[in-house]
């Protein structure tokens, strides 16, 4: 599995050229993309500027010597490469297994070309087997948890040890065990309109390419109506 993730990440790095501002994703597959960019910066003199999606990726990029800028200091990003936890046939996806969904979506929004790197196990018929992360403000989080519980969403707080996990943005994550999300777009709109929800892990209609690594090789899928 790790070998497939590495292949996908390295393949995505081939889309990066000199002078680009690039979004650096978070997670086990995006990790290999960032590593490959770091190698090219060091060995090939690749000239890029990175915008990171988490404190973890920031630390990784700094160690590798990749120059970084804040999202507030750029107007657009040429290319962002990130992982995904599930991708359906309509190129909607669930992200946030690494608890970085808010920053990931902020970086994805001004991106000209958005690529996901996954292994074949992440490609699914319907989203929802992977729990949907919902980032919520700490104030009123328990009330919101009960709202989700009453709606039948089978919520659970994301934990770190014995305590609730706190994101880089100082929020909590409530994971929803939905089983199958029949209409991801409609459910995303429902969550968008829920007071106390900062962001959710449904990335609908955002991705341009999905690089899928399997035992048979690498496939690049093009989203027909991205953006």
From Swiss-Prot:
Known EC number: 5.3.1.6
Residue stretches in coiled coil: none
Statement: the UniProt record of this protein carries the keyword Cytoplasm: no
SUPFAM superfamilies with a match to the protein in the record: D-ribose-5-phosphate isomerase (RpiA), lid domain (SSF75445), NagB/RpiA/CoA transferase-like (SSF100950)
Entry GO MF terms: ribose-5-phosphate isomerase activity
Oligomer and partners: Homodimer.
Keyword set, alphabetical order: Isomerase
InterPro entries for the chain: NagB/RpiA_transferase-like, Ribose-5P_isomerase, Ribose5P_isomerase_typA_subgr, Ribose5P_isomerase_type_A
CDD domains registered for this protein in UniProt: RPI_A
Organism: Streptococcus pyogenes serotype M1
Protein name from the UniProt record: Ribose-5-phosphate isomerase A
Residues annotated as binding substrate: 26-29, 82-85, 95-98, 122
Active site residues per record: 104
PANTHER family documented for this protein: RIBOSE-5-PHOSPHATE ISOMERASE 3, CHLOROPLASTIC-RELATED
Family to which this protein belongs: Belongs to the ribose 5-phosphate isomerase family.
Listed Pfam families: Rib_5-P_isom_A
Cited Gene3D superfamilies: 3.30.70.260, 3.40.50.1360
Involved pathway(s): Carbohydrate degradation; pentose phosphate pathway; D-ribose 5-phosphate from D-ribulose 5-phosphate (non-oxidative stage): step 1/1
Reaction(s) the record says it catalyses: aldehydo-D-ribose 5-phosphate = D-ribulose 5-phosphate
């Amino acid at each position: 599995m790790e070998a497939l993730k590495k292949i996908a990440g390295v393949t995505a790095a081939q889309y990066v050229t000199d002078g680009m501002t690039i979004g650096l994703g978070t997670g086990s597959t995006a990790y290999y993309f960032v590593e490959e960019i770091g190698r090219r910066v060091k060995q090939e003199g690749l000239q890029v500027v990175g915008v990171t999606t988490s404190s973890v990726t920031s630390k990784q990029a700094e160690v590798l010597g990749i120059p970084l800028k804040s999202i507030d200091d750029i107007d657009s990003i040429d290319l962002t490469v990130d992982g995904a936890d599930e991708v359906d046939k309509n190129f909607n996806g669930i992200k946030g297994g690494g608890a970085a969904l808010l920053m990931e979506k902020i970086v994805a929004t001004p991106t000209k070309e958005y690529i996901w790197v996954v292994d074949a196990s992440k490609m699914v018929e319907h989203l929802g087997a992977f729990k949907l992360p919902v980032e919520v403000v700490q104030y009123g989080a328990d009330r919101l948890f009960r709202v989700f519980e009453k709606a039948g969403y089978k919520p659970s707080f994301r934990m770190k040890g014995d305590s609730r996990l706190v994101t880089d943005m100082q929020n909590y994550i409530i994971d929803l065990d939905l089983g199958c999300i029949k209409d991801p777009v409609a459910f995303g709109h429902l969550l968008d309109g829920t007071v106390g929800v900062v962001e959710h892990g449904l990335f609908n209609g955002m991705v341009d390419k999905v690089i899928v690594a399997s035992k048979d090789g690498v496939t690049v899928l093009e989203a027909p109506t991205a953006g």
